[in-house]
């Protein structure tokens, strides 16, 4: 049933979905532009073809290079964060994964919150905000879950240098650990 739902969207609104893939294990993978995500989720939640759908997880990950080639266009960005929404239909046991395609706007602007549609998204968006630094527009609860208040670090973002700036060396004379600048020896 969901296959026909997404095929109908691809036929009537081709600019909403960039890619649509269905698998044997009742999983559907959709690559969506982030400005259509909220409206597609509203349609998923309140349409009769997918009556009992729930949001299971929102997660993000980082890659060294993120480039996706689809049949319609090529997406290649310097941003390395991908945001994935995981939905589950309780009646048909279908799983839907919505992947945000416009990754450059994920880091530069705020994503629209799904808090009005799914109550579980409040907690999941707080996790993403805290761990990856992703901001959500319209979010009411901005408390931290795990980090201390005032801590602006994002532990899951790989913003550290790939080459060490200092080395940790054990000094036998002073019987302590010493940080020395990294040097290459010839």
Where are these predicted regions, by residue range?
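Terminal low-complexity/charged segments
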Residues: 1-186
